[in-house]
A protein has these predicted regions:
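Bacterial N-terminal signal peptides that target proteins for export
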Residues: 1-11
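Bacterial N-terminal signal peptides
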Residues: 10-19
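Sec/Tat signal peptide C-region and signal peptidase I cleavage site
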Residues: 22-26
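Predominantly soluble domains enriched in secretory-pathway, periplasmic, or organellar proteins
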Residues: 27-411
Length: 411
C-alpha cells in the first residue's frame, strides 16, 4: 500500500511540475517545451548557372530531412523579358536580419526569409569592364556576411574593388580598391571578421596578383599574393593563416602563407590531366583533416589527408570520390558539423564514407545541373538559426577538437 501511495505521489508531483513549467513558459511568451518545433534542415540553391544552360531561375529550396524533396522556388520578381536572369555569382544570409542575399552578373537582391519577397535590389554603378562577362553595372561577385550579421563584403563584377554593403538597406557603404588584383571573384573571411582573402581572376603573366589580403575593419589592403597561374576557387584554414587555391593548368592546388604573402607549396593530383584542364573546386572539412579537390578531366574528386598545421597534405587515393553526375560545374561547401558535402554538380556526399547519398532535383524531377551557389540552412519555428557558407573553410573549434588544443576563446 505504501508503495502505491509513493507511486501516486510521484505521479502527482510530476504532473504539477509539468503544469508549472508550461505555465511559466507561457507567461514568458515561450512555447511549452513539448511544443517546440524540431529543427528543419533545408538547402537553398540560387540559379541560373553559367549562361542559363540549366534552364532554371530563382532560388530552389529542398528539404534535406525528406530526401531533398522539392519545397519551393523563390522568385527574383523579374519580368518575363528578363528571365531567367543573369548568371548567379554568389549567395549568403544574415541571421540577425533573417535575409537571404543573391548576387549575379548585374545585380544583388535581398530576400526576406519570412515572406520570400525581394526587399531591395542593388544595381551597382556604371564602370569600365575589366574582363569579358563582367557587368557594366559593376555588380556583383561573391558576397560574405561579416560577423555583425548586418554588413556584407561583396565583390564588384570582375572589377577592381570590393563593396561594403548595408545588409538591411542595400546601400553601398564603402568601396575598397584592389588595383593589383583587379578582377574580383572569390573570397573567404576569417571567423573574427578581421581578414578577407579575396581571389582575383587576374594573371601573373600580366604582372597582377591572384589574391588580395584585406584588413576588413580598417578597410585597407594589407598585401597581395601571387601564385603560379590565375587563381580560381580558394579556401582558408581556421585562422586565415593559410590559403589553398586552385589555379589554371593544374589539377591540384597551391598553398600560400597569408602573413608573409608567399606561396609555400604546389600539390599535383596523379593521373593524366596535364594540358587537358584544371581544378575548379577546393574545400576542407571543418576540422581541416581533409582537403577535397575537383578533377574535371577524370570526373572525380581527389582527397588529401591534412595532418598537423596544414602545410604538408598527403594524397589518399582510397578516399577518391566519383560522383554520378560527373565533375563539370565544380564547387564544394560543407555543413558546419562536417557530415555532408554539397558538390557543384548537384550531388550530396557523406563526408565520413566519401559516398554519394543524393542527387538534387527540381519540382519536375530534373537534376539541378548547377549547384555551386547553395547553402545548408537550419530553421526552427520559422526562424533561421544556423547557416554554413559558400566555401568549405576550416573551423577553429573543430580544428581544436581534432588537435586536442583550445581555441583563443576557450583559453
Amino acid at each position: 500500500m505504501k508503495t502505491l501511495r509513493k507511486a501516486l505521489l510521484a505521479t502527482t508531483c510530476a504532473v504539477v511540475a509539468l503544469s508549472a513549467t508550461t505555465y511559466v513558459s507561457a507567461q514568458r511568451g515561450q512555447r511549452p517545451l513539448s511544443n517546440v518545433e524540431p529543427v528543419r534542415h533545408l538547402v537553398y540553391i540560387a540559379t541560373p548557372g553559367d549562361n542559363g544552360t540549366d534552364n532554371q531561375s530563382g532560388v530552389v529550396v529542398l528539404d534535406a530531412d525528406k530526401d531533398y524533396s522539392f519545397l519551393k522556388r523563390i522568385s527574383y520578381e523579374l519580368p518575363a523579358s528578363k528571365m531567367p536572369g543573369p548568371k548567379v555569382s554568389g549567395i549568403t544570409v544574415s541571421l540577425p536580419l533573417q535575409m537571404l542575399y543573391v548576387t549575379t552578373d548585374g545585380w544583388m537582391k535581398a530576400i526576406d526569409l519570412a515572406t520570400d519577397k525581394v526587399v531591395w535590389t542593388f544595381n551597382g554603378e556604371s564602370a569600365p569592364v575589366e574582363r569579358t562577362r563582367g557587368a557594366a553595372s559593376g555588380c556583383c561577385e561573391r558576397p560574405w556576411t561579416l560577423p555583425d550579421g548586418k554588413t556584407l563584403l561583396v565583390g564588384s563584377s570582375y572589377n577592381s574593388w570590393w563593396y561594403y554593403i548595408d545588409g538591411a538597406t542595400g546601400k553601398s557603404l564603402f568601396k575598397l580598391p584592389t588595383p593589383e588584383a583587379n578582377v574580383a571573384h572569390n573570397l573567404a573571411v576569417t571567423a573574427d571578421g578581421k581578414l578577407a582573402i579575396t581571389g582575383s581572376m587576374s594573371s601573373p603573366k600580366n604582372g597582377k596578383a591572384g589574391v588580395a589580403v584585406l584588413d576588413v575593419p580598417n578597410r585597407t589592403v594589407l598585401r597581395y599574393m601571387t601564385f603560379s597561374e590565375m587563381v580560381r576557387p580558394l579556401t582558408i584554414n581556421h585562422d586565415g593563416s593559410l590559403v589553398y587555391v586552385n589555379v589554371n593548368d593544374l589539377v591540384g592546388f597551391e598553398i600560400g602563407d597569408v602573413k608573409t604573402g608567399k606561396m609555400l607549396k604546389r600539390f599535383e593530383a596523379p593521373g593524366d590531366w596535364k594540358g587537358k584542364g584544371y581544378s575548379h573546386g577546393i574545400g576542407m572539412t571543418p576540422d581541416e583533416s581533409e582537403i577535397w579537390v575537383a578533377d574535371p578531366v577524370n570526373d572525380l574528386w581527389h582527397v588529401w589527408d591534412n595532418p598537423g598545421d596544414g602545410r604538408n597534405p598527403v594524397y589518399n587515393a582510397s578516399k577518391t570520390i566519383k560522383p554520378s553526375a560527373g565533375v563539370e560545374h565544380s564547387w564544394i561547401d560543407m555543413t558546419n558539423d562536417g557530415k555532408l558535402a554539397l558538390l557543384g554538380d548537384s550531388v550530396v556526399i557523406d563526408v565520413k564514407t566519401h559516398k554519394e547519398i543524393a542527387v538534387l532535383k527540381d519540382e519536375f524531377g530534373r537534376r539541378i545541373v548547377h549547384t555551386e551557389k547553395a547553402l545548408f540552412l537550419n530553421f526552427q519555428d520559422g526562424k533561421l538559426i544556423e547557416a554554413n557558407n559558400q566555401f568549405a573553410v576550416g573551423d577553429a573549434k573543430a580544428y581544436a577538437a581534432r588537435m586536442g588544443t583550445k581555441t583563443s576563446e576557450q583559453q
